[in-house]
């Protein structure tokens, strides 16, 4: 994971995808990889933390509402660990209050499902500074 981008010779970071819904993970993975980026899937925030790959992540796309640790709890945990990964939250139910909290805590974007795939890719590229 994390190999070298042949064209630029730079070490590439991967996009971490976190959602408990396999079909969403499949779609996001296909989208990210079709854009020439490397994606890695995680079924929960806990699974992501278990792998301890923070330094290799270029951007994180996470569902706000997941069983176990929520996206907001993950954001707080990463902040505690002084890990400044750009986070894009996705949700089908998030309230305005949740959005404000996520953005106030440093999220790059907060997108509602069904996702505007072009906007998501543009947001990922901006987060990566590509």
Residue ranges and their predicted role:
Residues 43-44, 70-73:
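Acidic catalytic/metal-coordinating carboxylates
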Residues 97, 115-125:
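C-terminal output helix
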Residues 63, 91:
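Active-site residues of response regulator receiver
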Residues 66:
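Receiver (REC) domain active-site loop signature in two-component systems and cognate sites
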Residues 21-40, 127:
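Two-component/phosphorelay signaling modules centered on CheY-like receiver
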Residues 73, 94-109:
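Alpha4 helix (beta4-alpha4-beta5 surface) of REC/receiver domains from two-component response regulators
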Residues 41-59:
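Acidic, metal-coordinating helix/loop segments flanking the phosphotransfer/catalytic sites
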């Amino acid at each position: 994971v994390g190999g070298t981008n042949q064209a630029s010779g730079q070490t590439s970071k991967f996009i971490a995808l976190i959602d408990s819904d396999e079909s969403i993970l499949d779609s996001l993975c296909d989208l990210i990889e079709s854009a020439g980026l490397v994606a890695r899937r995680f079924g929960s925030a806990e699974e992501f933390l278990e792998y301890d790959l923070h330094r290799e992540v270029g951007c994180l796309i996470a569902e706000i509402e997941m069983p176990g640790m929520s996206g907001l709890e993950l954001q707080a945990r990463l902040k505690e660990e002084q890990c400044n990964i750009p986070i894009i939250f996705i949700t089908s139910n998030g309230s305005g209050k949740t959005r404000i909290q996520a953005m106030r805590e440093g999220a790059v974007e907060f997108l509602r499902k069904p996702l505007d795939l072009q906007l998501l890719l543009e947001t990922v590229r901006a987060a990566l500074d590509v």
